[in-house]
UniProtKB/Swiss-Prot annotation:
Catalysed reactions listed for this entry: (sulfur carrier)-H + L-cysteine = (sulfur carrier)-SH + L-alanine
Domain of life according to the entry: Bacteria
Phylogenetic classification of the source organism: Bacteria, Pseudomonadati, Pseudomonadota, Gammaproteobacteria, Vibrionales
Function: Catalyzes the removal of elemental sulfur and selenium atoms from L-cysteine, L-cystine, L-selenocysteine, and L-selenocystine to produce L-alanine.
Enzyme Commission number(s) of this protein: 2.8.1.7
Keyword terms of this UniProt record: Pyridoxal phosphate, Transferase
InterPro entries found in the cross-reference section: Aminotrans_V_dom (IPR000192), Cys_desulphurase_CdsA (IPR022471), Cys_dSase_SufS (IPR010970), Cysteine_dSase (IPR016454), PyrdxlP-dep_Trfase (IPR015424), PyrdxlP-dep_Trfase_major (IPR015421), PyrdxlP-dep_Trfase_small (IPR015422)
CDD domains the UniProt entry points to: SufS_like (cd06453)
Entry-annotated residues carrying N6-(pyridoxal phosphate)lysine: 226
Name of the molecule in the record: Probable cysteine desulfurase
């Protein structure tokens, strides 16, 4: 089924604006996606019609809010193939979900000398929490080197894997190059050694249909804001036995059965990990975003994104002094380096022409160090981008190169 791109673009009010005298070309969707009107409306409708604290009180508004909130949890469970909504923990995003796993599961199970294997290609959110818990427990974070082309070092991983390894952490799809990592092979090998696997799905959830049971993933996390949903809402999926054995990491209301000065008993899943008032509007809007995204032909969306990436890559490859780091065909990301030019300068010149890209290290210092660069200009496509926008990008790059 072909995508009706005009109809899709019309649903995104942010794309209708003028930036620096030019129509906005938004090419930063790997950082955060723009939001369709239905998601914006879902937030507005909640606050104008159903605003109430969930799981508390007996009035109609709280009953309506709770129904929508828990309905959203059920929808997320179905979206990723989880066995139950009890396996879905609401968080502020993938970063908080990874920290929850580190401070609850890892801190309560790791011992001195244990190892946590982490890919060199990871976002800082999937490195720093493991370093912190390693310091707390005496465990050791071990780097899985990437290949020279920026791919997951599967051979190196197999050599590093040993009975000392208790946790393996890697992204489903990397955020700098768009590399799809071999999570199935990693999960299988890790499980054979008795290790659990944590998958950062912040990028992967957008581009693949995820079935956590088919993957046999122990933990899978993602953020709503990269999936056309609002910022501030995220998801932690965990296997039931793991979640049940994990201690709460935050204390407060909602996550308790009984509180007294003699001691406190905690509620079961998922509530014991959700202390305090949750982001009700964010959860409801995430469910709306999932509905919206599933209404599209996902295969057609990915084909469209790959076509845009290929169009851009072919044109950029012809430009002297610009190179693409770790190019991955059939992705939706390109990371560029211009010899002798700071990435921020190139991005600024593009912004002056209405082209929004990301410049920096993309929260991936180890990957940048491995490539021998300080940062890149990252171009990342969303469902709303067009071939005409790629043409504008290329023209803007040529103009920037002439100025630099």
């Amino acid at each position: 089924m072909m995508l009706n791109l005009d109809a899709i673009r019309a649903q995104f009010p942010a794309l209708q604006q003028i930036v620096n005298g030019n129509p906005l070309v938004y090419l930063d969707s790997a950082a955060t996606t723009q939001k369709p009107q239905c998601v914006i409306d879902a937030i507005s409708h909640y606050y104008s019609q159903h605003n109430a604290n969930v799981h508390r009180g007996s009035h109609s508004l709280t009953a309506q809010a709770t129904s929508q909130f828990e309905g959203a949890r059920e929808q997320v469970a179905q979206f990723i193939g989880a066995p139950s909504s009890k396996n879905i923990i609401w968080t502020r995003g993938a970063t908080e979900a990874l920290n929850l796993i580190a401070q609850s599961y890892a801190r309560s199970t790791l011992q001195a000398g244990d190892e946590i294997l982490v890919s060199e290609t990871e976002h800082h959110a999937n490195i720093v929490p493991w370093q912190m818990v390693a310091e707390q427990t005496g465990a050791k974070v071990v780097k899985i080197p990437m290949t020279t082309t920026g791919e997951f070092g599967l051979a190196a991983f197999r050599q590093l894997l040993s009975p000392r390894c208790k946790i393996v952490a890697l992204a489903h799809i990397t955020n700098v190059t768009g590399t799809r990592q071999p999570i199935e092979a990693v999960i299988q090998a890790a499980h054979q050694q008795g290790a659990i696997v944590v998958i950062d799905g912040a990028q992967g959830i957008v581009h693949e249909t995820v079935d956590v049971r088919a993957l046999d993933a122990d933990f899978y996390v993602f953020s709503g804001h990269k999936l056309y949903a609002p910022a501030g809402i995220g998801v932690l999926y965990g296997k039931t036995a793991l979640l049940e054995a994990m201690p709460p990491w935050h204390g407060g209301g909602k996550m308790v059965e009984k509180v007294s000065f003699d001691g406190t008993t905690f509620t079961g899943l998922p509530g014991k990990f959700e202390a305090g008032t949750p982001n009700v509007a964010g959860a409801i809007a995430l469910a709306t975003a999932i509905d919206w995204y599933q209404s599209l032909d996902r295969a057609a969306v990915e084909a469209h994104l790959h076509q845009l990436q290929q169009q851009a890559y072919q044109a950029i490859s012809q430009i002297d002094d610009i190179r693409v780091l770790g190019y991955q065909p059939n992705a939706s990301v390109l990371s560029l380096v211009m010899d002798g030019v700071h990435h921020q300068d190139l991005a600024t010149l593009l912004d002056q022409q209405g082209i929004a890209v990301r410049a920096g290290h993309h929260c991936a210092h180890p990957l940048m160090d491995a490539f021998g660069v300080k940062g890149t200009v990252r171009i990342s496509f969303g469902v709303y981008n067009s071939a005409e926008e790629v043409e504008r990008l290329i023209a803007a790059i040529h103009k920037a190169v002439d100025l630099l």
